[in-house]
Amino acid sequence: MKHIAIIGGGVSGMAAAIAAAEQDPSARITILEHKPQLGKKILVTGNGHCNLANTHLTPDCYRSEDPRFIQAVIQKTSWQDTVRFFEDLGLPVRAKGNYLYPRSGQASSVLRVMTRRLKELGVEICLDTHITKIIPKGTGFQIHAGSKTCQSPKKICDADRVILACGGKAAPVQGSDGTGYDLAKSFGHTIVPVVPALVQLKVEDSPFVKASGVRTDGKVSVYVDGKVCSEDSG
């Protein structure tokens, strides 16, 4: 029996597990998640509403050293594919402008339908499992786990295929702490410098301090030597 191990139990890891199990029902699929629950970051996405996708999906929406890479990714999928995936799971989707949300308006609905499908497909789920090392062995891999400070991690399983779905580095509390980059490096992949794409603005002695945490439309202008060099609205 083919064994596919998926490192990371966020939305990408769960989606990968669902797709793998549906495409090959005979395969053994295992999700290895280092948090005590799956999809923890889903629950805070979109202020708890979970924006699933955006109908305005073009390379201009992204910044990259290689625009061709962005184009290649976009060409392989679409927002319609995303809607179809979730509706097939039993999740009605609604549009608000270009944004797509679960009709319930609750991120918990997304997590609920995904975990239900994982159970239906018989996907194995291992929580509180911190993967420290993945070693190529023959045509497969040995997967080792332990704590971040563990000097002698233990092998927990062998796998024929491994999918890294660890997320980025944007939300350590929810699980995206950058450990996936280290695992990718161990296979010889090159990681470009990681920078945040969405950050808060810190100001002093301003009435905006009282508005901390409030989300609203606005316009930002960047001045250099008294001249506007860039403006953006959103």
What are these regions (language model features)?
Residues 1-12, 30:
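Beta1/beta-strand and adjacent pyrophosphate-binding region of the FAD-binding site
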Residues 69-73, 100-105, 166-174:
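Flexible, glycine/proline-enriched loop segments at strand-loop-helix junctions
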Residues 78-87, 97-121, 234:
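An accessory alpha-helical subdomain
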